[in-house]
Amino acid sequence: MTNITTVADRYTAVWNESDAQLRRRAVAELWAHDGVEYVEGARFDRLDELVARIAHAHAEFVGSGTYRAAHAGDLRRHGDAVSFTIRLITSTVGEIAWAARVFLILDAEGRIREDYQLTIQPLADR
C-alpha cells in the first residue's frame, strides 16, 4: 500500500520544482499515464497537459519567489482515495495566501489517476 505522506510530499514538491526537466519527470512518476486533474472547472488530461498546467502555476506563483507550496499535514485515506490540504505560503512572512482541498484517486501502482483541487481559501487580489 502506498504511503500517503510520501504521495502528499511528492505532490507538493512537483509544484515547487523549478527545473522544467525534473518537474516533467516528477509529474510522469507521480501521475498515471492516463491521469487527469480537475481544478476550477478545467480538466487537464495526460502528461503533456498536466506538465503545462503545473509549469504555468509554478511560473505564476512559485517561480516568482512570492509563494511556496506546502501541504497542511491533514492527510486522510480511504482505500485508493487520498485527501489533504495544499496551500500557497508567502515566502516572506509565511502566511497562508491560498488553500485547496486535494482529493486523489490512486491506481494499483499508487500513481494519481484522478486529481481534484477544490479551493477553500481563494487567493486575495495581488
Residue ranges, per PLM feature:
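Basic/polar N-terminal segments that are highly enriched at the extreme N-terminus
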Residues: 1-6, 122-126
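Polar/charged side chains located within well-ordered beta-strands of beta-rich proteins
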Residues: 11, 37, 115-117
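A beta-strand edge to alpha-helix "cap/lid" segment located at domain peripheries
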Residues: 55-126
